[in-house]
Amino acid sequence: MTQTRKPRSDRPEVGPFVHNDLAREIERLKTEPAWHDGDRNAITLTKRVGLTLVLTVLRQGAVLREHRAPTGVALHVISGRMVLRVGDQSLELGPGEVVTMEPGLAHAGEARADTAFLLTLVEDSSR
């Protein structure tokens, strides 16, 4: 089985501070084979102890199956529209809207339009 690795970006993921231009990164994600050949693409912008930032783009109709994150989560929609299902609640989210979730909370989603969102994963250091 052949494994495809994403090309290394010119952008650092760690350091005393990291700067990202989200609009530029979204455009970059949409030029990669994962976007052209599938319904989504993502890149980890920052990963350090206790904090991970992941920028994700979804094509209209892309489904995020129900899953649970072991960390606290903040999902910030940058562009597009998506439905987020948490338990028996369904939220329609658009640009500028943010949802936070506690660790272990089951959730699922679907893109209603081509959508970009920033996912922030935060580990509780007191656990």
Question: Which residue stretches match the model-derived regions?
Answer:
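Short acidic-glycine-tyrosine-enriched beta hairpin
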Residues: D88-P103
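Short beta-strand His + acidic residue motifs that chelate non-heme Fe in jelly-roll/DSBH
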Residues: L64-E66, L84-R85, M101, A106-R112
